[in-house]
Amino acid sequence: MSLRRLFIKLLLVVSVLGFSTSLFANEQDDLKAHFLEELDDIIKIIEDKKLTKDERNSKIVAELTPMFDFKLMAKLSLGKKAWMKLSKDEQERFVALYVERMKNSYSSKIDSYENEEIKITDIKRKKNRISLETEIATAEKNLKVVYKFYKPKKRKKDKDTWLIYDVEIIGISILKADKAQFKEFLRTKTIEALMEALAEQKTT
């Protein structure tokens, strides 16, 4: 089972989760309420039999987008050295391609939604970052999944107050996995070739 397939499953069923902490209670309660509200909406979309597959996927992606800082994820996945070599226009192009890749990945995994049992195991906060540790029970074994949120100093347009910038599944960071993949690609090829490869994924 792929990391991204597990990830979208977790996003879709996490509405059963609850947050519990005595520190920063008000802010984390707000995060809980909004996060669960968004995910409840996603469940309703999935269960709406009147929607076509494309309509359903489009609506779900629209619900997920405000929860993630895809631009930051794109920048971090490419790495500072490679990012700084890009012009502003190239940076914008890379971000657009990365975002499209992520959205397509999530959309393609929606049909695999199942009602696995998930429970909160821990919540850790350090300044403007929150790590929400969960455990998902599958037929094979229990898997540890960590959602990583951060709070931007300034609220981003059309985005939530707290944003997901990475997810770790059984100790493997989606962000770091992308970074390693891109780094290996760039050992022998150019940034332009990488963007062309990402563009080709849009059509496949």
Give the residues covered by each predicted segment.
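Sec/Tat signal peptide C-region and signal peptidase I cleavage site
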Residues: 19-27
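Bimodal feature
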Residues: 70, 86, 93, 124-126, ...
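Short beta-strand edge/turn micro-motifs at domain boundaries
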Residues: 142-144, 149-177
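Early exported N-terminus immediately downstream of N-terminal targeting peptides
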Residues: 28-109
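Twin-arginine (Tat) signal peptide motif
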Residues: 1-10
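Bacterial N-terminal signal peptides
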Residues: 9-20
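Surface-exposed, charged secondary-structure patches
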Residues: 104-146, 204
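Low-complexity, intrinsically disordered terminal/linker segments enriched in charged
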Residues: 166-204
